[in-house]
């Protein structure tokens, strides 16, 4: 799947979706926010309604021309992460995207419930919210409690409190020259 795409399902974690969108756009990255439903409105786990840029059915899920700089992004939150994982067309698109050389980024519960749906995870270093690591570990991935981890073509983040660190790791992949500029603009001295 071409481009930088954040996928939203009802019950997504507000900070994990919106901080990533904000940081990437501050870095000059064109981001698509995609609803997995047949409507643009998606409601967060805290009751905030977001209008997505497009719906999954309108997105080009093809893998032709996909590179590591094409990123599928999955925020956590409950029941949002379960809803993402239950969307089989999205999970199949993620598997095809990753197999074609694309990058997958997930935070909080999403590494455990979404990234774990990929096949080739042996030796992958990852982070996630506590108690969501077992499905990845069962596939040979190695948990670390870091705020954000970039391992191969998978980027993971620990929790809402580390959403900006997670977003900066994605930005570092896409345009490393913008990371310090964005950190400075956001007054991030220690992240």
Regions found by a protein language model. Name each.
Residues 19-20, 93:
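Hydrophobic residues within alpha-helices
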């Amino acid at each position: 799947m071409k481009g930088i795409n954040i996928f939203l399902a009802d019950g997504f974690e507000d900070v994990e979706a919106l901080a990533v969108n904000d940081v990437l756009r501050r870095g000059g990255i064109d981001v698509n926010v995609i609803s997995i439903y047949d409507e643009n409105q998606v409601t967060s786990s805290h009751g905030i309604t977001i209008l997505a840029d497009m719906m999954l059915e309108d997105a080009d899920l093809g893998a032709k021309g996909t590179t590591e700089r094409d990123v599928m992004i999955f925020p956590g939150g409950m029941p949002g992460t379960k809803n993402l994982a239950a969307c089989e067309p999205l999970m199949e698109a993620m598997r095809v995207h990753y197999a074609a050389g694309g990058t997958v980024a997930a935070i909080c519960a999403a590494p455990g419930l979404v990234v774990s749906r990929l096949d080739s995870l042996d030796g992958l270093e990852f982070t996630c919210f506590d108690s969501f690591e077992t499905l990845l570990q069962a596939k040979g991935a190695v948990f670390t409690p870091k705020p954000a981890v970039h391992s191969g073509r998978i980027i993971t983040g620990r929790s809402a409190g580390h959403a900006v660190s997670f977003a900066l790791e994605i930005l570092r992949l896409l345009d490393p020259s913008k990371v310090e500029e964005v950190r400075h603009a956001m007054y991030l001295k220690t992240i």
